[in-house]
Amino acid sequence: MEPSGKEDHNCLPQDLGQEEIDYKQLLEEYYQPLQACENKCWCKKCCFHCMLCFHKKGLGIRYHVYRKRGPGTNKKIPGGGEEAIRRAIDLCFFNRTCSRTHTANGQTTEKKKATA
C-alpha cells in the first residue's frame, strides 16, 4: 500500500467519494451549547464539528490561558520594600512631619519645625 500523504484517522472515511458530508447535521452539531471536547484531530471536519473546536482550532482562541511566570518575578526589595515606601509617604504627605524640602535646583534643605 502506497502512502497517500493523508493521515489515516477515524474521522474521515477511507474512500472520500463513498460518503458525502451532511452539512445540515454538521450545522446542528455546531450550534449545540459549548461542552468539553477532547477531540485531538485537526482535520477540517473535526475543526468544525462543534463550536468549541471551531474556536480553539479554527480561530485559535483559547480561554483561561495563564502566563508562566519567570523565576525572578517575586524578588523582594531590601530594606522593607513597599512597606517602607508607604510609611515614608504617610509621614511626609499626610502628617506633614517631613523635615526636608526640595528646592528648584534639586537640592534638599532641612526645614525647621515651627513650635507653638
From Swiss-Prot:
A motif (Nuclear localization signal, and RNA-binding (TAR)) lies at residues 65-73. Residues 54-64 are annotated as: Core. One of its GO terms (biological process) is positive regulation of viral transcription. Pfam families: Tat. GO terms for cellular component: host cell nucleolus. Keywords: Activator, Host nucleus, Host-virus interaction, RNA-binding, Transcription, Transcription regulation. Transcriptional activator that increases RNA Pol II processivity, thereby increasing the level of full-length viral transcripts. Recognizes a hairpin structure at the 5'-LTR of the nascent viral mRNAs referred to as the transactivation responsive RNA element (TAR) and recruits the cyclin T1-CDK9 complex (P-TEFb complex) that will in turn hyperphosphorylate the RNA polymerase II to allow efficient elongation. The CDK9 component of P-TEFb and other Tat-activated kinases hyperphosphorylate the C-terminus of RNA Pol II that becomes stabilized and much more processive. Belongs to the lentiviruses Tat family. Interacts with host CCNT1. Associates with the P-TEFb complex composed at least of Tat, P-TEFb (CDK9 and CCNT1), TAR RNA, RNA Pol II. Interacts with CCNT2; the resulting complex is unable to bind to TAR RNA. The lineage of its organism: Viruses, Riboviria, Pararnavirae, Artverviricota, Revtraviricetes. Residues 37-53 are annotated as: Cysteine-rich. It is found in: Host nucleus, Host nucleolus. This is Protein Tat. InterPro entries: IV_Tat (IPR001831), Tat_dom_sf (IPR036963).
